[in-house]
Structure formats: C-alpha cells, structure tokens
C-alpha cells in the first residue's frame, strides 16, 4: 500500500504531530491553506468516507473539535475555523485516506468554497430528499 498517511501513522515518514491516540493522529498539513492548518487522520486506512469505520469517524470529529479549540486558544488566534473533508477526487480529495482538515480562518485569507449557490424550487428539494431517503432506507437493510 502506497499511502502517505499510513506511512506517517507508521512512523515511516516525518510529521509535525499535534495529537496522537489509539484511533487517530493529528498533524500539521505540509501544504497549509492557512497558518495552523491541521489534518486529523484515522490510523486505520479507509480510502474514503464510505469505507471509514463509524467509530473512527466519530472519534476523528471529536478530536477535530478539541484541536479547533486548541488552535483558537493558541498564538495562531484565528477569527474562525473550517472543518473540511473532501470525499472523492471531484470533491478535491488528493490523498485517498479519509481525513479531516482543521483550517484556521481570517478575513481575506483566500481560502473558501467557490460555489454559486442556487435557489431550487420546493418540488426539486422534495424530489432530492425522496431520492436520498430511498438510498438511506436501502442502506439499512
């Protein structure tokens, strides 16, 4: 397996570690969007969100919440925090090991989602809600 995050977890590659427990590792992003940008990575490999163990995923978010609070209290002193998970190449995922970004934010920092948000009709929203509920119900069986 040629996964850079698995190599970091195994200690085969260096990382500026911030947090380490039995399930996840938190470390500084090598290509930060902003100063203080961290990654929270499950130690068990999962290429994407669908493959992520539910307990690992829940723990990853709990740790990200703690790290976000620590970033706010640190000298980084951001005005806000984004938690960001890219799931799939088209969503911007570059390392195919599920992970959560903790991105400290300041006005004018240049980071953000560049989208044009629409105003769909209630009918269209209801249609998509039905489709997603159907898929959700099917996943329970």
Where are the model-predicted features located?
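HIT superfamily nucleotide-processing domains
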Residues: 1-141
């Amino acid at each position: 397996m040629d996964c850079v995050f698995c190599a970091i977890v195994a200690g085969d590659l260096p990382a500026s570690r911030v947090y380490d427990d039995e399930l996840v590792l938190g470390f500084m992003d090598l290509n930060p969007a902003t100063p203080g940008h961290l990654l929270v990575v499950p130690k068990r490999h999962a290429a994407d969100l669908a493959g992520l163990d539910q307990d690992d995923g829940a723990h990853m978010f709990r740790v990200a919440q703690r790290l976000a609070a620590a970033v706010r209290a640190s000298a980084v002193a951001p005005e806000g925090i984004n938690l960001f998970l890219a799931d799939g190449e088209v969503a911007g995922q570059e390392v195919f090991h599920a992970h959560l970004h903790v991105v400290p934010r300041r006005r004018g920092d240049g980071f953000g989602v560049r989208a044009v948000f629409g105003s769909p009709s209630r009918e269209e929203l209801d249609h998509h809600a039905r489709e997603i509920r159907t898929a959700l119900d099917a996943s329970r069986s």
